[in-house]
Amino acid sequence: ILVQRVSGDNYNKDYYPHIAGVGNSSNLYVWDENIDMNAGMLRMVFGLGTRAVDRTVGDYAKIVSLDNPLRIPPINYKDQRKFSQHYVDVLSLEQNKLITKSIDELISNDIKADKELFATIDQQALARMRELGLDSSQAPYILDFKKLLGKTKFPTLMRDILATLSKVYNYPVDIEFTANFKSDNSFKINLLQCRPLQTRGLGKPVKVPELT
């Protein structure tokens, strides 16, 4: 039995890390011919890593290609919010159990870090609210991690970690990690697990029958 301390901090009676996820030293999500597989990839979420490991209906983890962290899949701008993370798993210190909260509920509180590292205002929703004369201060956020991936050393450091571990293992690796940030944008990465990356391989070639 392996018992590990939960990585994170206390935020208004909730406990969670700013970022949690899994990383592969070989990118298995090659949806663009320009992606460098050997640069690695991350599948990460805000809050506890349960949503990065377990599939959730209608909620999506952030897929990061470490050769170009700001590269996004070919989706319409209006779909960016749809295909993003909407809910966050946290440990409730008050209820002493795992609970789920909306990202807007959490991000509106003090998270002891620059919230713009992780989320940006949904500009499309903001414009619509202004058209309708609604309170624009309540505009929803999109968890796009844009500032984190474009303005900090986090993606470069994660790429170096994966490359170093893969070199030592002499084999592609799969890791689980968390990251916690401070108000000055400094951060600490916690490596929770590391193991050889399991894949099925290419298998045998299959001959496709011709249509007659």
Per-region residue spans from a language model:
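Conserved mixed alpha/beta core segments that line enzyme active sites in large multi-domain catalysts
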Residues: I1-T212
